[in-house]
C-alpha cells in the first residue's frame, strides 16, 4: 500500500484514451494485485498489464516514463536506475529526496504535493506534456542520463573516500 500504485492507475485513467499507442506496465505492485486489477477493471482500462516483481533492467530498456507515487521513500534507487537508462521519472513530491534527485522539468517531472491529497488529473496533465512531445521527452531522457551519473558506483565511491579522509584528518 505504501507505494500507492492505485495513484498511477488513476492517473492512467486520464491518459489511456488520449494516448492509445501507450501501455501502462505495473511492476512490483506488492501483495495488492487483486485489488489493483479490480480497480483497473472498474475503470474500464484496457492498456494495463501487471508484471509482478522481476529484474527492472528489461523494463528500463523499453520504458519511456516511470511513475513513483509513494507517500514516502528514503533515497529511491529506482529513480537513479531508471534515469541511467534514459527513462523520464515522474515522482510525487511527498518526500525530501525528490528535490535532490530530480530537477523538475529538466530531467524528470515532480508532481506537486497537495495537502488535500494526490491529484490524478494534475499528474495526468503533467505526464501528458511529456508523452505527447517526443522532443521534450528525448531531451529530458538525455538530461536524466547525465544526472544519473552523479549516482554511479564510481561517483559514490569517490565521495565516500573523500568523507573518510576528512574524518581521518580531524
Task: Report residues per predicted region.
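Nucleotide-activated donor-binding/catalytic signature segment of Leloir-type glycosyltransferases, i.e.
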Residues: 35-53
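Short alpha-helical donor nucleotide-sugar binding micro-motif in glycosyltransferases
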Residues: 53-54, 59-63, 160
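Aromatic "clamp/platform" in nucleotide-sugar-dependent glycosyltransferases that forms part
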Residues: 71
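Short hydrophobic beta-strand element within catalytic cores of glycosyltransferases
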Residues: 88-92, 97, 102
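A short, well-ordered alpha-helix in the C-terminal region of glycosyltransferases
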Residues: 129, 136-150, 162
